[in-house]
């Protein structure tokens, strides 16, 4: 790995700075995040069809293939009483455009690695972790000016 780091002018570990995560409220936020993740290759212009992207779980969530490594989330299972109804409901969700506001919110929570969900969820995370789980402003507070 040291040779690769020298060759490419990198420092640190190979995965340093690449992995980001945030806690997600199960209610409706899980499916919003599913859509965000599975539509990322489309936004990045890697594919026109998210189900065709090799490293995506989209084709499994649409019932087009089985993947033994995936465990369906209860929110996804609640989309329908059988696999066909779930697949159709998920296809409808994927076809709905994500609002710019939702995209920005997910990106900000992910970048800051903060809890994404309703206020009650963030309050619960605050209480259990004894740490602030909300979004912080992107600027540093000004220092008070010296008094003459």
Tell me what each language-model feature is:
Residues 1-148:
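Short Pro-Cys-Gly-centered "Cys-loop" motif that presents a nucleophilic cysteine in a tight turn
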């Amino acid at each position: 790995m040291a040779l690769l780091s020298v060759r490419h002018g990198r420092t640190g570990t190979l995965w340093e700075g690449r992995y980001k995560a945030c806690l997600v409220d199960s209610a409706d936020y899980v499916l919003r995040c599913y859509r965000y993740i599975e539509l990322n290759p489309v936004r990045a212009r890697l594919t026109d069809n998210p189900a065709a992207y090799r490293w995506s779980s989209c084709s499994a969530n649409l019932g087009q293939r089985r993947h033994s490594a995936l465990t369906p989330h209860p929110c996804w299972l609640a989309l329908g009483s059988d696999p066909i109804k779930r697949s159709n409901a998920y296809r409808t969700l994927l076809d709905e455009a994500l609002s710019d506001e939702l995209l920005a919110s997910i990106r900000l929570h992910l970048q800051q690695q903060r809890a994404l969900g309703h206020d009650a969820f963030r309050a619960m995370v605050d209480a259990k972790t004894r740490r602030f789980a909300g979004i912080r402003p992107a600027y540093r507070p000004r220092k008070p000016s010296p008094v003459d």
